[in-house]
Amino acid sequence: MTASPIYATLGLSRNPFPPTPDAGSYFFTPRLEEDFAEIVHCIEARKGFVLLTGEVGLGKSTLVRRLLDTLEGKGCHSALILNTFLQDSALLSAIQSDLGWPATDSVEQGLARLTEFLIAKHQAGEVSLLVIDDAQNLSVESLELVRLLCNLETGQEKLLQILLVGQPELEQTLARTELRQLKSRIVKHARLSGLHEDEVIRYFDFRINAAGAEGRLSIAPVAAEALHRATQGNLRQIHLVLD
């Protein structure tokens, strides 16, 4: 792909700060790298229910894509639900469809068929993963369905690993009394936060060098301070300012 004249003038092969960051060149801070490793471990060890929360623009969806890429070659069979305005039985049908299993008419029948499917995957040595993005949109009833899915197990291991991804409102919903059983099943909760000021400098270097700068371009400390102050370390806001 030919670089835009603007980027080519700077010696870059592409836009280093696109509106949608690519998962292949994800920037890991030490705390995020630790959280990522723990999430991967929880899924591979079939521990069950993981929660990932953070404000809009902190890279949750990009991190999910990186996670799915990482797990793809490790015998993990995954379903990714992006339309969380589907509720109850419609949500279960979407989960079944994305896992490659025909939808059924009722929740009870769907859970029974899904259990059979997951047992077969488990016996084949595959890990089954359900990721629900924008999970703050789920109703209490749909989250109760998630709890039922959490209960599917062999006795020692969970048949379906679940990763709920959402904004902080999801934490508030899970704190409701009627969802205490679901909340108690969380084995790992990772909260994303904005970059610190020194991380903004490293993030700039990481993105600009990945686009071909090879150390020729840098950001002045005073500019990094202003960028951090204006964006609070929010990745989406950083990209909007620098694009």
Please report, for each region that a protein language model flagged, where it lies by residue.
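Conserved catalytic segments around the Walker B and adjacent sensor/switch elements
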Residues: 50, 73-83
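Conserved NTP-binding/hydrolysis module of P-loop NTPases
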Residues: 12-19, 76, 86-105
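Conserved catalytic network of the ASCE P-loop NTPase/AAA+ motor domain
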Residues: 41-45, 70-74, 120-125, 136-141, ...
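A short, basic N-terminal segment
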Residues: 1-46
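Mid-core helix/loop region of P-loop NTP-binding domains shared across ATPases and GTPases
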Residues: 7, 86-87, 102-145, 154-158, ...
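Helix-loop-helix "sensor" segment of P-loop NTPases
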Residues: 121-125, 129, 154, 163, ...
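Structural recognition of the conserved hydrophobic beta-strand(s) that form the central parallel beta-sheet
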Residues: 53, 129-133, 161-167
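Walker A/P-loop nucleotide-binding motif
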Residues: 45-66, 84
